[in-house]
Design a protein with these regions (language model features):
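Conserved short alpha-helical segments that host acidic/polar catalytic motifs at enzyme active sites
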Residues: 1-249, 253, 262-286, 300, ...
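A SIS-like phosphosugar-recognition module
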Residues: 168-169, 180-182, 188-189, 207-251, ...
């Protein structure tokens, strides 16, 4: 949530800052702004607009030149999405600008104290308290903005990424982070600060991640990181493995559709070098239970993981909503393995649950897509999914690779605990290896979904039914439709229909059914469920690996092991949600009210 960009160098700052904000649009926002020091010691040039980034760009048609600047896309938490509440915020002299991602929990107390000291506030935000506090601290530290930032961070409660710039020292930008991402881009005669490497990858592939409660000061030729005590921290640089073109649409009308079609490669990349074993220093024999913690789509991937790990590894698995987990004081200890799943590696609820589990002695083995992320760094081991950048807010290829990660972990546990024979492991490996090609096959057959889906664009409700691993797949299908089409959608286990949900069925209600493997007991059960809803007027769309004749519309997928079926059956569900959103005229890549990376609780 929120996008942050800072640039200082030899070139005009306007282009890299605005372009960087554009690359961060996927994070979700409702306003945008920029601050530029155009004259030393004079008030900063500032422009901010509610709405889309284009509103800001239109207002920047005649902007004075500056070689440094900071920019921000805001997701409203304190105060509505207005020009006034948009970032950056200024001190009373207009020389100091600050942008912020996160939530300052003690801002009311700070604001009250600052108002007593004569500070004038213009917005309703928690951020404005910080810029006034920083202004005072800078004066107390003889104009040293980095020292002032360290002082201020000690007074703040909550989570934050902060960036500040002052017109007295226009080439210096100071940043800080606590429980919220901030990364440095190290260039040649220019340096960057941003919430995500996507903001500056067109300019440099050398990055540096900040640790918890660290402060960074950049100039065009230097980067210095310190802790809150002022001690210099040696931060490790790394090279970004993907290129700028990966963040472009590549001829597709939307990022989401591009990412749906990138799934075969993402799956293959996640499997490479791992089918013979995971290179992690974890001995699974010491654990008595496993807890998977995640949110949203990652939670649904975790539910599938439970089936695989319990089947192949014969160890109990709980799947928990990260936002609820630590508040119920769960029982866990050194014999518990906790697996957090997060695409960004910065999901605040998941990070807080991870820290709670770690404090109780649990071992943390995380699944992330983003190298160098906070969750990855704070884990005992991490399995990176190699999905590449996922720009669309609604997750597709990240979900597919999270499923693959779950299977790889289940396979590793099964082998380590001797619950899988060499023959059984070989069959699983062969089935996993075949998945990229099978997803390609599914993608070749989804074109008819466009016309079919649009028939139901005005439906009041859509139900998704599944059994076994088809149930979490149904949950994911319903979530995608809610996110993108803004329609009421629910996912249910087929056997639960008669316990209440069947009351939702009316004439013409679309029901998407995920069929289990042919000739299985569950396939027979699902066929009965379908007859129940059809008898009440439902229109049934079945996703099946065999020619099921009981549906009104059939979407065929290739055969695979039942545990692996979600990788294939979810693809038509993603396409259904995408086409429904397009038919309803919605913003596919940036659905309303949603953010890609949820970095607040």
């Amino acid at each position: 949530m929120c996008g942050i960009v800072g640039y200082t160098g030899k070139n005009s700052a306007l282009t890299p800052v605005v372009d960087g904000l554009r690359k961060l649009e996927y994070r979700g926002y409702d306003s945008a702004g920029i601050a530029l020091p155009t004259e030393i010691g004079k008030p900063l040039f500032i422009e901010k607009k509610a709405g889309k980034l284009k509103n800001l760009e239109d207002a920047l048609a005649k902007t004075p030149n500056a070689t440094s600047g900071i920019g921000h896309t805001r997701w409203a938490t304190h105060g509505g999405p207005t020009d006034t509440n948009a970032h950056p915020h200024l001190d009373n002299e207009g020389k100091l600008a600050l942008i912020h991602n996160g939530i300052i929990e003690n801002y009311v107390q700070l604001r009250t104290e600052l108002e007593k000291r004569g500070h004038k506030f213009k917005s309703e935000t928690d951020t404005e308290s910080v810029v006034h506090l920083l202004s005072d601290a800078r004066k107390e530290n003889n104009g040293d903005l980095a020292a002032a930032m360290r002082q201020v961070c000690k007074q703040l409660k909550g989570s934050f990424t902060l960036l500040a710039i002052h017109s007295d020292d226009p080439s210096h930008i100071v940043g800080a982070r606590r429980n919220s991402p901030l990364v440095v881009g190290v260039g040649n005669g220019e340096n960057f600060l941003a919430s995500d490497v996507a903001a500056f990858i067109a300019h440099t592939k050398i990055a540096l991640e900040l640790g918890q409660d660290e402060v960074v000061e950049i100039t065009p030729t230097s980067v210095e990181v310190t802790n809150l005590a002022g001690q210099v921290v040696k931060s490790k640089q790394y090279e970004i493995s993907w290129d700028a073109s990966a963040a472009e649409r590549g001829g597709f009308p939307h990022f989401m559709l591009k990412e749906i079609y990138e799934q075969p490669k993402a799956i293959a990349d996640t499997l490479i070098g791992r089918l013979d074993g995971l290179n992690v220093k974890i001995k699974f024999k010491k654990f008595e239970k496993i807890v998977i913690i995640a949110c949203g789509t990652a939670y649904n991937a975790g539910l599938v993981g439970k089936y695989a790990i319990e089947k192949w590894g014969q160890i109990p698995v709980d799947v928990e909503l990260a936002s609820e987990y630590r508040y119920r004081e769960p029982s866990l200890d050194k014999k518990t393995l906790v697996i957090p799943i997060s695409q960004s590696g910065e999901t605040m609820d998941t990070l807080m649950a991870l820290r709670y589990a770690k404090s109780k002695g649990a071992t943390i083995f995380s699944v992330c897509n983003t190298n160098g992320s906070t969750i990855g760094r704070e884990s005992d081991a991490v399995l990176y999914t190699h999905a590449g950048p996922e720009i669309a807010v609604a997750s597709t290829k990240a979900f597919a690779t999270q499923l693959i990660a779950m299977y790889l972990i289940g396979l590793e546990i099964g082998k380590q605990l001797d619950h899988l024979s060499k023959k059984e492991s070989k069959v699983i490996i062969e089935q996993l290896s075949a998945l990229p090609a099978k997803v390609e096959q599914v993608l070749e057959t989804v074109e008819p979904l466009r016309e079919l889906t649009r028939k139901f664009k005005d439906s009041q409700s859509v139900l998704f039914l599944g059994r076994h691993v088809g149930y979490p797949t149904a949950l994911e299908g319903a979530l995608k439709l809610k996110e993108l089409a803004y329609m009421h959608a629910e996912g249910f286990a087929g056997g639960e229909l008669k316990h209440g949900p069947i009351a939702l069925i009316d004439k013409g209600t679309p029901v998407v059914a995920i069929m289990p493997a042919e000739h299985s007991v569950l396939a027979e059960k699902m066929a009965s469920n379908i007859q129940e809803v059809k008898a009440r007027g439902a229109v049934v769309i079945a996703i099946s690996e065999f020619d099921f004749i009981g549906a009104d519309h059939l979407i065929r997928i290739p055969k695979t092991d039942q545990l692996l079926q979600p990788v294939l059956s979810v693809v038509p569900l993603q396409v259904i949600a995408y086409e429904m959103a397009v038919a309803r005229g919605n913003d596919v890549d940036q659905p309303r009210n949603l953010a890609k990376s949820v970095t607040v609780e």
